[in-house]
Amino acid sequence: MSSEVRRGRFITLEGIDGAGKSTHLSFIRDWLARHGVDAAFTREPGGTPLSEKIRDLLLDPGTVASLDAEALLAFAARQQHIAEVIEPALAAGRWLVSDRFTDSTYAFQGGGRGVPFERIRALEDWVQRGLQPDLTLLFDLPTEVAAGRMAGTRVPDRFEQEAADFHRRVRAAYLRRAEEAPQRIAVLDASRGIADIQADIVLHLERLLERG
């Protein structure tokens, strides 16, 4: 008798640039490994050869794209990512942790660019067919603090070089998403010390682990 493989868990990390996702992603990787969780790690846009090419286009400061073209590119990359990486991992029982997912599109293209949420939702329904993360960790930080952290660290990409108002709209859109899906999105105050933030991360990971 063959036993059915239990579907893996899907975790996403979100936040404005400079919120510290990369630091916490490394912590999550180590924590899951210590607890015997078979997990794969990926990112958006990206995660597949085709999606990485789209990522390069989206982040290149020289790219000129209409609002709708930008949103469509994000979802084109996402569809390939889901088909090639996300769904196979989850179906095989692996946990999948992604640095950004659809909440980023609502935040950057919806909040930042002004693409209507309803238009993004229609693309989400078409591309994802009901797929949603089991847990989203939203690292929230005032935009001024985030800008200070980012200053001088590297050459800014197409989104990072946007004006302060753009990033304030992105943050507001993220918080709106959290209000709309409180059962999935955990808002973490990223202005605190790393140890305090990671203590909260552990609480959410433990709850997810207990759910099996």
From Swiss-Prot:
Keywords: ATP-binding, Kinase, Nucleotide biosynthesis, Nucleotide-binding, Transferase. It comes from the Bacteria. One of its GO terms (molecular function) is ATP binding. Pfam families: Thymidylate_kin. InterPro entries: P-loop_NTPase (IPR027417), Thymidylate_kin-like_dom (IPR039430), Thymidylate_kin_CS (IPR018095), Thymidylate_kinase (IPR018094). ATP binds at G15, I16, D17, G18, A19, G20, K21, S22. It catalyses: dTMP + ATP = dTDP + ADP. Its EC number is 2.7.4.9. GO terms for cellular component: cytosol. The keyword Ion transport does not apply. Phosphorylation of dTMP to form dTDP in both de novo and salvage pathways of dTTP synthesis. Belongs to the thymidylate kinase family. PANTHER family: THYMIDYLATE KINASE, UMP-CMP KINASE 2, MITOCHONDRIAL. This is Thymidylate kinase. The gene is tmk.
